[in-house]
């Protein structure tokens, strides 16, 4: 495996030259105009060209705070909706974690540097799940689900993103800090659905817990398995859940009676479902599991219509990233390889090796930015965090 990783790293250095030999945008456009390429083939080849031309760039991390993240290992990164910031979880040498926000506004070609804003250190508490939350405005908060310890029960905390801004820029942005006592959560999701406005869901052991931030009211739905992945639909009144048993089911948010009628859709994988992603039209759902299967499901016909081969997972909780604008699917495997597929035909476009030897402790965390730095007109790009390093793979 190590020899394969080194071979791919060597090939990566030559990618730009290789990709341009007889395989460029102008020749593909000409073939399409002459009818030699249909729309599907043209789209796939265009994506393959852009993805194959992505070059790894080391990002310089600068700090506005003396307690810099630069010396701490990255555990997880999560891009905001507008791709202008990353929420990061870092492992520190003493027991506990650091949480912070990295501003991506300075991440531009050819200068690749970012700024770490203020950090918060939480000793002896581990986050089981997290997501962005839109309470006052888009991505105004981060929802963190902490596991319980001896003198502190498990809870869900809505942390204002403004808490991470410097003192000078935090004026008139107090934000609201909320805490809710809940059982330990495997997963969480924030709702933008009008049927569950200002609500979040927590996937628990054999239960889904829906909580209203405004009133504190909680509604539970009993399940037969641990809920490892969740996502609310934006328009349909549904909350999709992926379970350890391999079942994917939707909760109809219009049903107040927990006893019957709330289970709207049922799909099945052969292993624990670790990620669910609803596509924009809400007619399809993509899911990945602990056997490395990635499937695209037609929600109307309740059947699998496409599989994406090559992903490696045996026991890890690994997210799936779907980006419809670019027509790609991204996933990091337990073997530490980042793979990119064409969303439309499941063709494997690229396999990116980790800069470090494969290890359970060094699985990269990735995020895809539709506009690097959140700047209008900026190129999309892939961000990768591994150990203490942050890398960027901008689209050409």
From Swiss-Prot:
Short name of any one Pfam family annotated for the protein: Beta-prop_DCAF4
GO CC annotation, single: Cul4-RING E3 ubiquitin ligase complex
SUPFAM superfamilies named among the record's database cross-references: WD40 repeat-like
Source superkingdom: Eukaryota
Subcellular location: Cytoplasm
Alphabetic keyword roster: Cytoplasm, Repeat, WD repeat
UniProt cross-references to Gene3D superfamilies, sorted A to Z: YVTN repeat-like/Quinoprotein amine dehydrogenase
Presence of keyword Repeat: yes
WD-type repeats, residues: 268-307, 312-351
Stated name of the protein: DDB1- and CUL4-associated factor 4-like protein 1
Organism listed in the record: Homo sapiens
Gene: DCAF4L1
